[in-house]
Amino acid sequence: MKSLGVYLKHYKKESIIAPLFKLLEVVFDLLVPMVVAQIIDVGIAGNNRPYIVSRFGILVLMASVGLCCSFTAQYFAAKASVGCATELRQAVFDHIQALSFTELDTIGTDTLITRLINDINQVQNGINMGLRLLLRSPFIVFGSVVMAFTVNVKCAIVFLVTIPILFVAVFGIMLVSIPLFKKVQAALDRVTGMTRENLNGVRVIRAFCREEQSVADFEKSNDELTRLNEFVGKISALLNPLTYVLINIAAVVLIWQAGLQVNIGSMQQGQVVALYNYMLQIIVELIKLASLIITLNKSVACAERVSGVLAVPTTMNYPAKGGAAKKVTGDAAVTFKNVSFTYAGAGAESLSDISFTAKRGQTIGIIGGTGSGKSTLVSLISRFYDATSGDVMVDGENVKNYTKEELCNKVGVVQQKAVLFKGSIRDNMKWGKEDATDAEIWEALTTAQAKEVVEGKQDQLDFMLEQNGKNLSGGQKQRLSIARALVKKPEILILDDSSSALDFATDAKLRKAVHNLEENTTTFLVSQRIAGIRQADQILVLGNGTLEGNGTHDELMKTCEVYREIYFSQFPEERAAYNNESGVIA
């Protein structure tokens, strides 16, 4: 929580001016009943029209000044709250960008979206209301009691008795309801997460005819949220009727006591009206204060959740100064030395004691069953994750010695799921290289077999993509994603099963084009299909996180049982020939 105060400190002036102008408004609010009392006791009682008009003018003037004070307070409170929320949102977003995939996996996407949007909006609302009302309500209550004593001491005692009872009623309800609001927020998070998951996976849900189950699951979570909201609502609903009953009882006592004072001549009718108005001001402000405290408690809870995200330390630390990229030694592009890796919270290792060397310019194929660790292995090269033990070397230097920019410039990654951003094709291609020329973009598109795709669009490079490239097919998105990585001409290119949506002919052309890249480009091909990696200079065979085999296709057919089984599962007609020849299948 203290860490969030830093952002409000940037708006010290606004945070001081807003409450001050609210206090000025309160002063005029407290004077209004006294002026009304004078109009009744002097103007109306004495049939003094000029006096009534003059006091009416004073009321209009006070209302105008109070309105100006209110507008000023609102302006500065809004400026402080919006500015603080904007800086806080930016800080959280910047911090998220600095987190490694390990922290992102632990926190979860749904949680981060909720913190960035809902929680920070709640913090903004709390700051706004706090600056405007946190001092106003107590000051009105205290000021009304003081003003009541200036009118009549005996009647003011009714205020002293009523206010503590009102406080107990109002804040008693709050003490019960505030903890429940945290449960409501947690239930809302679950509903939000389920909504996002269902919307993202709506095609899968319909493909498996799981609509009814999804509706049932959502209904269960939604009913839980509704139940909590209704329970809290019932408790909170007691606030207004209970306080109004108390205030009406107090008003009856006040009027009775004031009537006695009027009968003996120690009070005038206008003063009775003033006391009643002060009583009404107190109840209104107590209800406002109760609502404010509920809002502030929600804001504090949300602020703690946001602060929790900011407090998550990143395990991915980069050196402040570069230079590792210049220290190229030997012909080894990528080296794994006894590398093991375990995902946060996982019981078993995803990779265990992996060692191999990929020379500069080689094509490395990676194959294995589902969950064997293929994507995890290549993620360590680009340092999406850090190895639990062992060393990952790029050009003879540990990846931890590279700055983020150096490693990003050296390694190009195309992941399994093709992600394109809203904007033109040219804009998306320049993610790989900001100053890329059209010629460089077309060269990359040609290599990625995407030239025909772009040429077929009316605006070609200026063709506007929808969010996540929804106006393209799966294969088109994959080819554009590959082209985006190729634009910057990376020294290490990682294709993580990124051609799964391509037809066989296009995939073959792509493999050939990638194989003909510049001599110093080292390519990692992750694939489920042996045809996609058969011609690789080196093939890594993974099984349950261990390196089961390493070599060329011919070598692995002789030495690696796992590789042979994968091969024969995809080419069953070759098994008989292999058994007959007991040799290598060309």
Regions found by a protein language model. Give the residues of each.
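Helix-loop-helix
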Residues: 47-57, 147-161, 175, 231-304, ...
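ABC-type nucleotide-binding domain
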Residues: 327-586
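Membrane-integrated ABC transporters
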Residues: 1-29, 36, 44-59, 65, ...
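An intracellular "coupling" helix at the cytosolic face of ABC transporter transmembrane type-1 domains
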Residues: 10-13, 98-102, 118-131, 135, ...
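Transmembrane helices of ABC transporter permease
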Residues: 10, 14-27, 38, 58, ...
